[in-house]
Amino acid sequence: MPKVALYNNEGSQVGEITLDDSIFATDINETLMHEAVNMHLASKRRGTASAKTRSEVRGGGRKPWRQKGTGRARHGSIRSPIWVGGGISFAPKPRDYSYKMPKKAKRKAIKSALTTKLNNGEIVILEELTMEAPKTKKIIEMLENLSINHKAMIVTGASDLNVYRSTRNIPGVSSALANNLNVYDVLNHDYLVLTKDAVSVIEEVFC
């Protein structure tokens, strides 16, 4: 089982924590991670693109000129897709792009993502993170103490409104709940800052 340093808010090591092999030291499946990222991005698509086909465009019910004898190309409607102002061929319509992966595949993908982060030294674990009030400055100082100056996601075990409000105004920094982790957010941030409680929740939920 991998052992990782445990830090306080001042950036000092206060101990070590042993992580679960089945989550933080599993075989990495890049295919499943790729599929999980695609699933997440697909679910975020608005799917509101819409255009009219030739049957929906106003007008065009009368044949513009007779079939033969004019010397001009034959046409049956001025709303054909080849006419200016005509309908759109294969016009897009509002649709839902979201889909779901099997639960086992989704769980394997998040384990692969967490293992990748740990192997790259991009997981930092805090003994605790308590905030009596929203304080952006405190989060910035904590990240500086931990030598984190890239995109980071702070993961807590339970909902903490003060942490959320303290991170939302820092560019490149976000917060999340341990039981709501997804592969896209894990891989899209350079560092994961996990509280000790968050590790316990992750090992319980994704085991």
Curated annotation (Swiss-Prot):
BP GO annotations:
translation
The entry's keywords: Ribonucleoprotein, Ribosomal protein, RNA-binding, rRNA-binding
Q: Which domain of life is it from?
A: Bacteria
Give a yes or no for keyword Metal-binding in this entry.
no
Pfam families noted in UniProt? Ribosomal_L4
> What Gene Ontology molecular-function terms does this entry list?
rRNA binding; structural constituent of ribosome
HAMAP family reported for this sequence: Ribosomal_uL4_B
Q: What is this protein called?
A: Large ribosomal subunit protein uL4
